[in-house]
Amino acid sequence: MKSLRFGVVIFYAIIAISPLVWLSVTSFKSKADSISTTARFLPTLDDTEVDGIYFHPTLNGYRLLSKPYAGAEHSFYHYLFNTAVIGIISTVAAVTLGTCCAYGFSRFLIPGSRDWLFFILSTRFLPPLAVVIPVLMMYREFDLQNTHFGLIILYTAFNLSLSVWLMKGFIDDIPPAFEEAALVDGYSRMHIFRRIIVPRAVPGMSVTAVFCMISAWNE
């Protein structure tokens, strides 16, 4: 039974990864090979004319991306770098702040905690068009337009509610007995959070980071 489950997982993993592998292979093809009706997926360095499933790998596609295109001011790699920097920093900020906030809601008796959690979640209910004008006016006032910092603040604020709710569920599953034993040994709350909660919440933080990164990247 275990082998059957493992086989099913491998089968679905191959189906999920195959399009990514095909895209990666196609990026090294020439224009003629990429639009060929024959599925050419095996690279070869043979100088003779290839046929069938073989193709000559080339880096022309990546060279074209290094130049500005379609009236753009910069190359594709410049925009890719900006997206990566903004996405990574906003993800780290959202997961860090969300984990700290979730720990407070999970372990302390906060008056009106349910209302506060609903308020945090309700920030995702608003359609983007409802906040475009206020955000634009605020960014103009503080000169945050067309800046990395402005986008990082925006994406962090947008993903913070998701981070809080996801991390609260993960932290709730961590037994409080670990913290009680640490308190008896003289640990402070900060040491408990850093040495006990965070290491056990790493899987949840990883999942949350994936969601936040996808959200920031798609924007």
Across the structure, where does each feature detected by a protein language model lie?
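A structural signal for multi-pass alpha-helical bundles of membrane permease subunits
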Residues: 2-219
